[in-house]
């Protein structure tokens, strides 16, 4: 048994048992992946995967138990590799933050400025992606902190802390008829072409749910990943825009006006996520503390390092 075999078991579960994708993620060949699986099954005397011909469909009960143990072993191995750095490089290094465009552009600048004053020798890397991509980066150890409004709070491999709550607001031209309606209604908004975020990011599900509850179908003519793109097309007259309220900026003041829609759409929460059980340098804990003053470094450490491992029934 070796680490590569355990990595293959873990990656197979992550890639929905597609061995081609497993091989790509681990920079090896598909034949090599298959060989490692066969050798591990022969060594343990069990079948790890449910098969149909050569295709993997899922995990057997022993395979599921093995996956829990493999996750634990690989996580602890990662912690061992981090250990020396934790004690020798406490105030310098690289902090990698995976986040959405909206948070990187509008929510993080002041926090990053304060962080740099505390840790001037720490370099920062911002990776922008979708909530799903952010969660994957955290799970794979490719990011230290993940920040998003969706997904991070319900992933068992991650620990998530609330940062702040926000609502959507409506962007329209200054002379738009909706500026004369108070309070705004979903029915009045649904009459106009709408530009907003694409599925799966920046509270899009809250928008869809609000219209669905009223039995309305919004005319979404364009969906985008970031607020600045939405603003651009609203300014061009393609439609009205639903954007995060924190995405305000000077560039919109000349042509656009924001209308309050807090009474129409449910609030969203921005979450700060870390990989559960993973050791971190002190500056990682401090960054989270800067974001959420209600959490102490000790509280954050305790929750991240607490075990939530599945109980394994060894009487399979």
From Swiss-Prot:
Residues 1-59 form the HTH lysR-type domain. Pfam families: HTH_1, LysR_substrate. InterPro entries: Cbl_PBP2, LysR_subst-bd, Tscrpt_reg_HTH_LysR, WH-like_DNA-bd_sf, WH_DNA-bd_sf. Residues 19-38 bind DNA. It comes from the Bacteria. The keyword DNA-binding applies. The keyword Transcription applies. One of its GO terms (molecular function) is transcription cis-regulatory region binding. Keywords: DNA-binding, Transcription, Transcription regulation. Belongs to the LysR transcriptional regulatory family. May be an accessory regulatory protein within the cys regulon. This is HTH-type transcriptional regulator cbl.
């Amino acid at each position: 048994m070796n680490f590569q075999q355990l990595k293959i078991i873990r990656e197979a579960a992550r890639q929905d048992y597609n061995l081609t994708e497993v091989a790509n993620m681990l920079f090896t060949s598909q034949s090599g992946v298959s060989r490692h699986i066969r050798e591990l099954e022969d060594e343990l005397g069990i079948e790890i995967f449910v098969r149909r011909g050569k295709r993997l469909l899922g995990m057997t009960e022993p395979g599921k138990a093995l996956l829990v143990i493999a996750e634990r072993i690989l996580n602890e191995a990662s912690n061992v590799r981090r250990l020396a750095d934790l004690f020798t490089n406490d105030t310098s290094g690289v902090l990698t933050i995976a986040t959405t465009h909206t948070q990187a552009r509008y929510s993080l600048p002041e926090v990053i400025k304060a962080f740099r004053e505390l840790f001037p020798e720490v370099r920062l890397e911002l990776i922008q992606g979708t909530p799903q991509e952010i969660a994957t980066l955290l799970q794979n150890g490719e990011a230290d902190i993940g920040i998003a409004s969706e997904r991070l709070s319900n992933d068992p491999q991650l620990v998530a802390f609330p940062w702040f709550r926000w609502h959507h607001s409506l962007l329209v031209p200054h002379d738009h008829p909706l500026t004369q309606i108070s309070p705004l209604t979903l029915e009045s908004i649904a009459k106009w072409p709408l530009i907003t975020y694409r599925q799966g990011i920046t509270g899009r599900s809250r928008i869809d749910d609000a219209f669905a509850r009223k039995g309305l179908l919004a005319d979404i003519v364009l969906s985008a990943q970031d607020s600045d793109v939405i603003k651009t097309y609203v300014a061009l007259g393609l439609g009205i825009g639903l954007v995060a309220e924190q995405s305000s900026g000077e560039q919109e003041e000349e042509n656009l006006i924001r209308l309050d829609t807090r009474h129409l759409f449910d609030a969203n929460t921005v979450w700060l996520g870390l990989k559960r059980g993973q050791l971190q340098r002190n500056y990682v804990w401090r960054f989270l503390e800067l974001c959420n003053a209600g959490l102490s470094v000790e509280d954050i450490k305790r929750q991240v390092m607490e075990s939530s491992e599945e109980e394994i029934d060894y009487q399979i």
